[in-house]
């Protein structure tokens, strides 16, 4: 929602102890989101048929149909009988200040999901990406992956601020991939009390997104890989860019291409998303994707990717 005035003008200095405000907004945009769904949507666009695991509300039917149409397996989404799907509601004023609320809703039921059931249904799991979710659910799914020997990626992002050091240590220890941005990278080290080197010794690969500078992939005793982003045609909305990178990167892993190539696919998809308002509003046209990918990363890289896009 957009408020044409300034929030600051609506507050009375000596009445801040009893605030009661209502804003007449100009427009209402309802957009699909959620980190898991955003990543799955992107992977579906790339043809990898990801399995979305999470908890949604009894209002999920329309969203499920959308994801199904875009190549996402939604059969393992738990549906709450009593709660709505989690959502973020935000109003932005003329100065781009925001007032927002996040409703967790059915997300709290993610802790009730057992990954073994999912694995049995599909004949095994190659990699489980554990993203920002119900904290108890994240811990349960991490422990289940560890106990069952299922490779997993740790990607706590927005939940880092809420979790304590011990919880974060549990979530990342033994991960095949650890995802974060630069700020989160430092916060992880501060909260866990582990140095960068100590964390690298506990995970397979540390994947750090660097904004417009691309991504860095590190591994203990191995070569550091840095990949830049393709040039943007325009910058419309940064929301969901990190999810798009993960979608491209994870798709590359599913294809079996080298890490550098997977990161390039992630950066290309992230660039398409930043050029579009909304996290799932972009269309991946294969010819256009490959044309820009080739321009950014060269013919050899493009040949390795083209065969997987069809």
Q: Where do the model's predicted regions map?
A:
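A glycine-rich helix N-cap at a beta->alpha junction
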Residues: 68-83
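A short acidic, amphipathic alpha-helical/loop segment
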Residues: 136-144, 166-171, 261
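Conserved phosphate-binding/catalytic region of the ribokinase-like
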Residues: 193-310
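Conserved phosphate/ATP/ADP-binding segment of small-molecule kinases
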Residues: 146-151, 157-226, 234
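Glycine-rich phosphate/adenosyl-contacting loop at the front of the ribokinase-like
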Residues: 1-51, 62-65, 300-310
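Gly/Ala-rich phosphate-binding loop of Rossmann-like dinucleotide-binding domains
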Residues: 44, 146, 254
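Conserved phosphate-binding/catalytic loop of the ribokinase/pfkB sugar-kinase fold
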Residues: 78-80, 88-127, 132
